[in-house]
């Protein structure tokens, strides 16, 4: 009898875990804004998102238990954003992995880079509603140039390093040539 109870308990625990694996629902017509680069703004991104968006859902990558290398905020545009209608669905994505060089090179080269996989997430508690895997291939890694690369091209970047310092063999992503 004890064995049966243990088996049932284990089965229920595993079923509960798989039930939490869900995609993040991104509404049709959502405007995506993708920022990559230095981690300097990471500490105030949540404040920025909640000041510009309503009904904000915070999302993180599952790459680190403490400080995510990718984060995103999904919500609707609040009043007061010039040129954006109130209620427009917006997904703001920030990639910090790789630091400043990923705020310069992929933007200048229009290169796809790894980002959050919104179809491979787990519901969480705390500051982030979802923890997600990543998708895509960074420049300089085999398969990056493939049409099947699911990474995204950043819309803009941030760097706290002088872009002129991104020269071979230092400060380039995965051995890419200097700009």
Segments from the language model and where they lie:
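Repetitive helical segments and hydrophobic/amphipathic motifs
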Residues: 11-14
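N-terminal segment of the mature folded domain
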Residues: 22-179
């Amino acid at each position: 009898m004890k064995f049966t109870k243990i088996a049932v308990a284990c089965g229920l625990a595993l079923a509960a875990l798989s039930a939490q694996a869900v995609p993040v629902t991104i509404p049709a017509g959502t405007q995506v804004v993708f920022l990559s680069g230095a981690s300097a703004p990471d500490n105030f991104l949540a404040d920025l998102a909640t000041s510009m968006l309503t009904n904000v859902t915070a999302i993180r990558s599952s790459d680190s238990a403490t400080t995510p290398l990718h984060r995103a905020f999904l919500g609707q545009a609040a009043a007061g954003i010039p040129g954006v209608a109130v209620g427009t669905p917006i997904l703001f994505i920030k990639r910090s992995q790789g630091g400043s060089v990923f705020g310069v090179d992929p933007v200048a080269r229009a290169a796809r880079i790894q980002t959050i996989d919104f179809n491979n997430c787990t519901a969480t508690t705390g500051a982030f509603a979802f923890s997600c895997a990543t998708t895509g291939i960074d420049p300089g890694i085999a398969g990056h140039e493939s049409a099947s690369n699911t990474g995204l091209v950043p819309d803009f970047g941030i760097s706290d390093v002088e872009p002129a310092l991104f020269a071979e063999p230092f400060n380039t992503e995965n051995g890419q040539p200097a700009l």
